[in-house]
Amino acid sequence: GGTPSNLSVKQLRTLTDKMKDLFPWDETEEVAFECEPGTLSEKKLEALRDIGVTRLSLGIENFDDHILEVNGRAHRSMEAFRALRFANTLGFDQVNIDLIAGMMDETEDNWKRCVDTAIEQGPDCVTIYQMEIPYNTTIFKEMKAAGRVTAPVAIWPTKRAWVDWAFNRFEEAGYSVSSAYTVVKNPETTKFVYRDSLWEGADLLSAGVASFGHLGGVHYQNQADVGPYMTEVDSGGLPIFRAYETDHEERFVREFVLQLKLGLVHPSYFQEKYGEDVMTRFPEQLQ
């Protein structure tokens, strides 16, 4: 994550070689890699394949150049199509594309064209998000400066309706819904090991500036600025900014909420792992 495709081929090889020295990839089930389409060339994608990336995720978001521009995206549609073409010819195990519903200036017609274009491209997996404006984004700062209190994006009921339409459209095209965000072309062969493991409480070792991690029930975030981050790293310390240790109840509720995103829960899983009967703990939520 964190759009590592901004790194050069040389930097990527150096980084992953050092990672493999610490954590050999010989028996790795999945190596997922997030890309900004405008940063990709055929040479870089070849390097990613040779490094061992199995799941390539392209942050396309939309296929309309105007939408991409007004939302501050660095790439344009031709770069997205080019990246998809290269990725499909290089034989990655799985290619995912991200779409965002309700971006600034987006209309229902645009959204429907975007979904249909994604179907025409035929990726293995499509992940659909709904546009949000976090407080630390450029768009939010511009809103605050202008005295606006409402984000210039589609309202939540509209975004939910568009996502619902998209899921139905993908299912008509032969895709299967695998989570609250994701559709896959072939559920028998298309797996997302990282997501499924994380939603079952697996550790997540985050290394980047401002990144969030989860180790042994402790949630943490690294330093959000490069200066303090490098000061800690150069001195041999851990660049952790804040952390929170969860208890048994919090870990149980966390996993329950995360697995609701799959659209179903397995009571036996929680009974065996936490000794909790979700059917009696959350009867109203599971109705």
Predicted regions and their residues:
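C-terminal scaffold of the Radical SAM
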Residues: 1-276
